[in-house]
Amino acid sequence: EGNSSYFLLAVSDDSDPNGSWNKYRINVTSFDSNIDSPNLAVDDEVIYLAADFFSPDSYLVLCVDKSDALVGDSLEITQVSLSGSGNQSLGLPVTWDANSPQYLIQSSEGTGNGVNFNEIRLWSIENPLGTPSMVSHDLSVPTYAYPQHPAQQGTSVRPYLFEPRFWSCVQRGGSVWAVHHVNSSRARVRWYEIDMQGWPDSVSTPQLAQWGEIDAGSDVSTYFPSIAVDEDGNAAICFSRSSSSEYISMCEVRRQADDPSGEFQPMNFVRTSTSPATTGRWGDYSGAAASANNSG
């Protein structure tokens, strides 16, 4: 709004989304005036709100007392921030594990040609409702690069993919599952399961348990993914795909917890466009969620 920055937060007063909602407008202009890419996560006690600010890259995380928001009271909020130099967009995993730290995840950025990145950065928020602080760990991963903007049938306009930033991640069963799009020659969805090893409270550090890419074949790009994981460790990824001979489609893939490591099952088409998208924007708020009633 003009030169001001706000988070808009809405919380239902019970499990019925058709009922009443408690709505908040949180002014963060004092941090910076050009908020972008808001993200949200929750755990047992805290609602976490994160966003990018671009003068220069910097990141703000608000820690909101969940009990206030559930009953519509004035919010008790603490905050922590960090510089974005060399890293991009804080992914905030929804936290299903009780008594677990809140983690965040960032991809690399900043090289002149946007290629040959080989790590991602993990953060843990300590004491979120007191005096919050953050500790980090850099995890080595297979090399990745900025994604190529994908072709689509019927137009020269290509959806803008930004960077290999993390918009979607889940914390469940002691792991963080995260997805982004990578590859400077043909964009592909990449996914990771990161075993957090109880970090930072343990003497161990996070380990890459498994990873993979969703490759739909020659000339087909996959991009803007979102991921969901259920209580049994089954996972699903929703994403877009297109090529010079395909309109943009919405697709999904799934894996069972006992499937071979690093593999998802064949993709399914959910919906296919019947004409090209010409605005230049597509899918950056893709979302996926596990059913609350059925696992698997």
Residue ranges and their predicted role:
Residues 1-296:
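C-terminal PAP-associated
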